[in-house]
Amino acid sequence: MHASLQLGYTNEISAEYLSHMDDCYFKEQQPSSFIDEKRAYVKAHPPIAIYRVATEGSQTRDGGVVQQGTLRMVFTLDSGQQVCAARKGDLVVYADGRTAQIVTTAGEANSHIALVGSRLGNGDEIINTPQEGFLLFTREGVPMAEDFLPALTLAEVQLPSSDVTMEGVR
């Protein structure tokens, strides 16, 4: 497990942060008709939520840690440490040695990259990530892909025993 305690970033953000998500899209060198078209889209579909990318060192609600991200996307943390993005199938390790696989992600169109909010095969969920900068976001009125963080089905959850029910599973 990682020896140093990293600051974990969640998907919790302020309304002000969301309101500035599109600021970088409007460059003066772009044609004004293009800018007007983008502004109309942004006004009609403002950002409503973010999903940070999970990496090595991301933590779960039940105390697990992503040990090795296998997606070839590398982030340099504030500490200078480099971590890889996690994806579907990567393992989360718990202090007692148990492991669980990441089973829900941003979907095929996003290379099955794991996110804060991704679920594991044991019903656990990734709750934070040590990287701050790379995220996906949703817009009002714009549906996400069907395979973007889908709800788990009972068949996808590895139950510890037959008499246990999992919260949040349909």
Give the location of each predicted region.
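Intrinsically disordered, low-complexity proline/glycine-rich segments
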Residues: 1-170
